[in-house]
Amino acid sequence: MIKFRKRCKVSENIKILVVDDEPTVLESFKMILKIKDYDVDAFLDGPSALEKIEKGKYDIAFIDMKLPKMDGLEVLKKLKEADSELEVVIVTAYATDASHANAINMGALEYLRKPFLMEEIYELVDRGLRRRRRVKTPKESATPKPPEGIH
């Protein structure tokens, strides 16, 4: 008898956090990400998102740079403190080389300029997931371990 294994969808269990103070941008993100069946939580400000990060685990976050209450870099810092493996993309319409470098130095995966294309979002999700898998994969030791039970 031949058994076929069920193939899991790539998007299965992928949770994405989006924070942007513009409702139309949030809706665009949700629409783009739901095409791939990603599970998306969207918030209009950083504090609302940070409350959720304690309750759930996200794979990727897209955070607007200019937000009310706290800016995107502050949200990035707090997200990384709560979950160092979370991949964060800073999104902005006001990109400068200095702010790009600052975001990367603070641990951002990338800096996405508005307006963006659907393909850019998908590429960043894929890149973030690949990076998370590399981080989670235990690195093999250069020196082999001695066999257990032999003295």
What are these regions (language model features)?
Residues L44-D45, D71-E74:
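Acidic catalytic/metal-coordinating carboxylates
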Residues E74, A95-E110:
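Alpha4 helix (beta4-alpha4-beta5 surface) of REC/receiver domains from two-component response regulators
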Residues K57-F62, L67:
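Active-site beta3 strand of CheY-like receiver
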Residues E51, L73-E85:
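Short amphipathic alpha-helix used as the core "switch/output" element in two-component signaling
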Residues A98, F116-V125:
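C-terminal output helix
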Residues L26, P68, T96:
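The feature encodes the CheY-like receiver
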Residues P23-D41:
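Two-component/phosphorelay signaling modules centered on CheY-like receiver
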